[in-house]
Amino acid sequence: MKQYLDLMRLVREHGTFKSDRTGTGTFSVFGHQMRFDLAEGFPLVTTKKCHLKSIVHELLWFLKGDTNIRYLKENGVSIWDEWADGNGDLGPVYGYQWRSWPAPDGRHIDQIANVVNMIRDNPDSRRLIVSAWNPALIDEMKLPPCHALFQFYVADGRLSCQLYQRSADIFLGVPFNIASYALLILMMAQVTGLAPGEFVWTGGDCHLYANHLEQADLQLSREPLPLPTMQLDPDVKDLFAFRFEDFELVGYQSHPHIKAPVAI
């Protein structure tokens, strides 16, 4: 995960100080890209321990089209708690946009199912895109999407994906996002009969919060360890049939967890 540490180091050394919505302050650079070849291992950060359970359950929750934190809470995942209302609702966030984008004529568009079908039927299409950024509904969302749009690409029997992340919390958020989209590629590849290719991460406002600098320095002092592998139950052929038990992370070694506050 040298790519990730290089981004963190870039922002730590050359980031511009900016105010932000949370009042915490950030050091930021604009525009950065990282590439991860999934044949080289599963890109889960090793310079601190990452909570894979939260990553997997959050992705399954997105794919269900769910926008209430009840499922997450039932599975011991608290990463969305701070933004939910008293009923656990988050408004029309990721899952709603991915699975039920509202059209002007009253239809609801299942972007994920459409992309699965297009990958199978027309893999050379340049329209293999899913967007979570719906300007008409941004004000109804408790937190507008940070990872806003992603595109799949098929070449030589391999499925790749590029994400555009408008807002990238490098210390806390980005390791989750990298692992989540890498896992989505593995799942999509399996159900479409392709091999996993690359995950390309493109960031807009890439930032370290001002109260994460000591944690970033500690992480930068650590040497990356070999990447693990992720095994999926090969019998699952329907993207929406995956369960938590269908994933096994093999060979994950990491440095200890580093605690840091979440900016709300």
Swiss-Prot record:
The gene is thyA. It is found in: Cytoplasm. It is an enzyme of class 2 (transferase). Its main location: cytoplasm. Belongs to the thymidylate synthase family. Bacterial-type ThyA subfamily. It comes from the Bacteria. Transmembrane segments: none annotated. PANTHER family: THYMIDYLATE SYNTHASE (PTHR11548:SF9), THYMIDYLATE SYNTHASE 1 (PTHR11548). GO terms for cellular component: cytosol. (6R)-5,10-methylene-5,6,7,8-tetrahydrofolate binds at H51, D169, A263. It comes from Azotobacter vinelandii (strain DJ / ATCC BAA-1303). The active site is at C146. Gene3D superfamilies: Thymidylate synthase/dCMP hydroxymethylase domain. Catalyzes the reductive methylation of 2'-deoxyuridine-5'-monophosphate (dUMP) to 2'-deoxythymidine-5'-monophosphate (dTMP) while utilizing 5,10-methylenetetrahydrofolate (mTHF) as the methyl donor and reductant in the reaction, yielding dihydrofolate (DHF) as a by-product. This enzymatic reaction provides an intracellular de novo source of dTMP, an essential precursor for DNA biosynthesis. Its EC number is 2.1.1.45. This is Thymidylate synthase. The keyword Cytoplasm applies. It catalyses: dUMP + (6R)-5,10-methylene-5,6,7,8-tetrahydrofolate = 7,8-dihydrofolate + dTMP.
